[in-house]
Amino acid sequence: MKRKTSERSQNEIHVRKPSNQETIAERKEIQLQDRYKDFAKNLGHDIATIEIEIPGSGIILKPDLVDFTSMEIIEVKSGVTRKYVREAIGQVLDYAFQIKQIENKVYNPVILVPGELSKDLSDLLKELDIKVIYENRNTFLR
């Protein structure tokens, strides 16, 4: 596990050209990540990003945030729909598993989203023992 300084977004949008079609992707996820990072740091938390190199594979995983104070690995998503949550589940569980295998440390999986989840999705995450942090006005709730 290699600790990295998390990037701050300087742009509100960036342009990508998948399949020869120009699209504009808003950087809502990075903005949410930056707001949460500032919030957590104001509470005295040591929060950063890391790189996880999977031994023998050449694959490097890059979780969005790690809170070293609360031992949480955090996947940030810009939406609250099932699609976003399902993707986040796979990512955050993989990160937590890899850290446990490589470092023999247990980091609790957390998903950070821009708003409250539906009861169904909240129940799913509870069943999987994945915590949720969501933004509500100018604060973050669990």
Residue ranges and their predicted role:
Residues 5-52:
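Acidic-basic catalytic patches of nuclease active cores, encompassing PD-(D/E)XK
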Residues 81-91, 120:
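Active-site-adjacent loop/helix micro-motif of nuclease/hydrolase catalytic cores
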Residues 78, 97-132:
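Nucleic-acid nuclease catalytic cores
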Residues 46-69, 126-128:
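An acidic intrinsically disordered interaction segment
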Residues 90-98:
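Short, well-ordered amphipathic alpha-helices
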Residues 129-141:
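Charged, structured surface patches that assemble and position nucleic-acid processing machinery
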Residues 36, 65-78:
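Conserved catalytic cores of phosphodiester-cleaving nucleases, focusing on short active-site segments
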